[in-house]
């Protein structure tokens, strides 16, 4: 995340105005969540599942693989441990996923003015047909704040998704990369089925609203919370009743 943020900062030093040269760059159009003219935006959102897993995503597998989990179950109720593990993993994944976004925005504040985006400047591809385009041009702080919340919630989902496969994994690498592989596979299948509006990478990216055109924010948050409940139920209920399969 830090490397990506640094790359964005270097780019900002070289770009101080729009493509047409008639409107200055602003804090919302140069950071990693608000630009589309380099590949770093795509890199961040595709690597986000791995970033989210790094803090505690593999901790359940490691506790069980080392035998330490048995000692925990002796001292604490199994249900309490599983719920606490899920909550901690979810929160840590959300924070890890959102930090590059936040740091990039903060670094952007050092170089460019805090003015509202202008559609005629052609800094991005957000137009009046995209979701929340009125927020983007009139209330940009609110617009990117909502997307930060979406990013953190999705980061939590990716982190807890790694918990859901821990009981059947043979090594921690599979646990770490499973959310990434799942996201890539889902992206490919959704593209083939023409349902890109449900892909997490498109839902999280503030510059990809064209792919979720027609969806309300209520439906987006409903999808995210449904995924949270599904991961919670699968992880807690399954591990409450059985030990590792392999």
What are these regions (language model features)?
Residues 1, 76-78, 170-172:
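Short loop-to-helix capping motifs
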Residues 1-61, 86-159, 163, 205-226:
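Secretory targeting signals
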Residues 6-7, 105-117, 171, 191, ...:
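Transmembrane helix-loop junctions in multipass membrane proteins, especially transporters and channels
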Residues 54-74, 78:
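Transmembrane helix boundary and interhelical loop/hinge segments in multi-pass membrane proteins
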Residues 76-88:
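Amphipathic cytosolic juxtamembrane alpha-helices at the membrane-cytosol interface
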Residues 89, 180-184, 228:
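Residue-level recognition of pore/gate-forming positions within transmembrane alpha-helices
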Residues 164, 225-246:
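Junction motif at the cytosolic side of a transmembrane helix
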Residues 172-186, 202-203:
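Central hydrophobic cores of alpha-helical transmembrane segments
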């Amino acid at each position: 995340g830090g490397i990506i943020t640094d790359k964005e900062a270097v780019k900002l030093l070289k770009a101080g105005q729009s493509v047409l040269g008639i409107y200055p760059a602003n804090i919302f159009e140069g950071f990693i969540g608000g630009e589309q003219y380099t590949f770093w935006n795509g890199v961040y959102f595709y690597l986000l599942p791995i970033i989210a897993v790094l803090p505690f995503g593999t901790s359940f597998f490691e506790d069980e693989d080392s035998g330490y989990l048995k000692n925990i179950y002796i001292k604490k109720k199994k249900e309490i441990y599983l719920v606490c593990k899920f909550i901690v993993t979810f929160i840590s994944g959300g924070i890890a996923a959102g930090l590059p976004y936040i740091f990039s925005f903060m670094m952007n504040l050092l170089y460019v003015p805090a003015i509202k985006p202008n559609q005629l400047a052609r800094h991005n591809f957000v137009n009046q047909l995209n979701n929340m385009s009125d927020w983007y041009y009139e209330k940009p702080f609110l617009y990117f704040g909502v997307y930060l919340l979406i990013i953190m919630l999705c980061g939590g989902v990716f982190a807890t998704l790694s918990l859901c496969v821990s009981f059947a994994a043979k090594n921690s690498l599979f646990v770490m990369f499973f959310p990434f592989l799942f996201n890539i596979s889902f992206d490919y299948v959704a593209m083939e089925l023409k349902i890109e509006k449900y892909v997490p990478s498109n839902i999280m990216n503030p510059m990809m609203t064209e792919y979720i055109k027609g969806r309300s924010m209520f439906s987006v948050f409903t999808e995210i919370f449904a995924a949270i409940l599904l991961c919670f139920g699968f992880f807690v209920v399954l591990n409450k009743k059985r030990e590792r399969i392999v």
